[in-house]
Amino acid sequence: KHPLLNTFYKTPAHFYEVDVKDFYLRVNPMLLLAAGSETEEGVASYYNQRGLSLRGGVGENVFFQTSFYDSQVRYPNYINQYTDSVGVVPGAALYKNFSSSLFDVAGAKDFLLATAYVGVNLGKYIGFQLGHNQFFIGEGFRSLFLSDFSTPYFSLKIKTRIWKIHYQNIFAE
């Protein structure tokens, strides 16, 4: 279990990692490849996403995270119809039609996505997070206002902890 070129994968969880006194940085590539087919119409669907994630912190109270994604997707027809009618990809916003000289990719979409935030903890009871991101509360829960269907948006999150009560304020654009 030796690091690749004495630099990469020094720890199994991170492609590249810097961990020194009062500073850490973790860099990870992201890859999502998936394929399927729509049974009624026999149309092949796929998801080809590549990206990079950076996560770090300064001291114990300042932290940041950013992710960049490049995606080529061929959705099932019912999602393509919706995407074409509203002009946006769910969760990612604007797209362009993707074409390839090697493969039949009629109806495929090409889009970029970037998210980032910076956070500060003021002691153990109050924390702030400012960025361009999506919010998810819980695992699989959706509220009237927060959804994984939305695109990333500019926001300020304030977390407060008093006794056993954890309170979040989210101010979003």
Where would I find each of the regions flagged by the language model?
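Outer-membrane beta-barrel channel domains
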Residues: K1-E173
